């Protein structure tokens, strides 16, 4: 039995979504796959599931009743620590495999279970990564339900309403700094700033407004406006303390051949995303600045079993 799930790009709204603001994401065509077969004891890639690198897999196993121990094989094309939802993709693919062994998979159930896994492992978190990996395509997260509601997730008096949103087919250039940063501490540091710094709290609210304006610009195919909003979103994320000199270097390099660029994901390293109609030139610009660059495209398929 096997299942796969996509990585994700947050186009607008990372960190602000934790505080109930809007965020916009899309699944991308880099996927994680998890294969399972019966075995005398639980194993992951031949090793113990107690190894720290399998903490998401182990927490996912605890969510699903299985008939017995399994040998799991994890294959992921989503680079770890790059801000592209690698842990969410592996978590969702693991849950998809485990549920699939019972007969069928349900994206809503898996999205909720995967969010609980990430919350347990990371601490304070939002469901945007795990819901995008579960549903595929474009997702808009709002504090209140509107049209095209997929599901609602609640935790600790907070509520996120996940909506399907139709985005035009888009290619994005990713610039990976090669610097990894743990999501949990970054989220905790932003929380501390927002609770004690009025400017940080206002930045979070502005990011929420930018997200809705950015969605409108993308729907109108106004890439110039969308790029400007990405640039502003990056500046606000830097104000929240999740920037890094290498992120700024790659953003500046990418902007010379694109409509706009910003960090994507938790920050502190990881990746930048650029909106460009000259992707080959943007890739070269990022590489010249010291980053690893590649092009991804939106993926409409979420969690799915493999034949």
Where are these regions (language model features)?
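C-terminal nucleotide
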Residues: 1-12, 16-17, 25, 33-66, ...
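Short, solvent-exposed loop/turn segments at secondary-structure boundaries
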Residues: 22-23, 48, 83-86
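Short, flexible loop/turn motifs enriched in small residues
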Residues: 28
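N-terminal pre-triad scaffold of radical SAM enzymes
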Residues: 72-81
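Short aromatic/hydrophobic contact patches that present stacked aromatics
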Residues: 83, 271-273
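Short, conserved phosphate/pyrophosphate- and ester-handling motifs at nucleotide-, phospho-/glycolipid
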Residues: 87, 265
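Active-site-proximal alpha-helical scaffold in enzymes
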Residues: 88-103
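Glycine-rich nucleotide-binding loop
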Residues: 267-269
């Amino acid at each position: 039995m096997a299942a796969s799930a996509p990585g994700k790009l947050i186009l607008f709204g990372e960190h602000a979504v934790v505080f109930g603001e809007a965020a916009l994401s899309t699944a991308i065509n880099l996927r994680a796959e998890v294969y399972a077969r019966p075995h005398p004891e639980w194993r992951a890639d031949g090793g113990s599931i107690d190894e720290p690198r399998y903490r998401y897999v182990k927490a996912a196993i605890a969510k699903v009743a299985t008939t017995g121990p399994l040998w799991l094989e994890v294959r992921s094309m989503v680079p770890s620590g790059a801000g592209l939802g690698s842990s969410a993709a592996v978590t969702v693919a693991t849950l998809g495999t485990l549920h699939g062994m019972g007969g069928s998979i349900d994206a809503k159930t898996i999205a909720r279970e995967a969010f609980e896994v990430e919350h347990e492992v990371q601490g304070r978190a939002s469901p945007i990564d795990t819901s995008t990996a579960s549903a595929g395509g474009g997702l808009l997260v709002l504090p209140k339900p509107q049209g095209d509601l997929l599901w609602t997730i609640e935790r600790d008096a907070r509520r996120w309403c996940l909506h399907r949103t139709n985005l035009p087919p888009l290619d994005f250039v990713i610039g990976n700094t090669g610097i990894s940063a743990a999501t949990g501490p970054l989220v905790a540091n932003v929380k501390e700033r927002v609770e004690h710094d009025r400017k940080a709290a206002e930045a979070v609210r502005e990011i929420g407004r930018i997200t809705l304006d950015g969605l409108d610009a993308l729907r109108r195919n106004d890439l110039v406006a969308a790029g400007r909003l990405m640039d502003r979103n990056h500046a606000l994320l830097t104000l929240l303390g999740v920037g890094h000199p290498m992120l700024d270097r790659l953003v500046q390099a990418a902007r010379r051949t694109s409509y706009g660029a910003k960090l994507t994901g938790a920050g502190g390293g990881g990746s930048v995303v650029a909106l460009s109609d000259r992707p080959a030139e943007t890739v070269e610009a990022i590489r010249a600045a010291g980053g690893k660059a590649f092009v991804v495209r939106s993926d409409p398929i979420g969690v799915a079993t493999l034949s």
